[in-house]
Amino acid sequence: MKRSRAIAGAAALAVAGIATMATATTASAAPTAAAAYNGACGSGYSVVNSVPVTGKGTVYLTYSARTGKNCVVTVRNSPGKRVYMYTYLTATDGSSDWVYDSGQYTSYAGPVYLPGKGICVDWGGAIESVSVSVSGSNCGRMAPGVVTHH
């Protein structure tokens, strides 16, 4: 009887230890909160699409129904020291030049603007060495496009 209680007690301690380690691992591996859209495009612009820059931030595509323009901004999850960032936007059909912003920034790159009423757009951005691009999206509506992580 004592032996079975000792084994049961050891098993309970082992399970408790594993549960504690699992909790500690989960807590320490918590991801950084995703960057929220910061309103950098100005009043009247609403987020119509976004794509994460893995572990670093988010690129937001916004649109103003009043002006008919798209706007893109790349936002870091955790602002801090200056790091290389860029953001870009162009018409998928090649009817416009690329508009972009790049440099060493503490929190976001952009905004960049392009008339977008009824056209598909290519857009994306980067934070440090992690980049993402979306091709052929939105086309005058809320549509996902093709996402490429680099």
Regions found by a protein language model. Name each.
Residues M1-A29:
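Secretory targeting and sorting signals
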Residues A29-H150:
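Post-signal peptide N-terminal regions of Sec-secreted extracellular proteins
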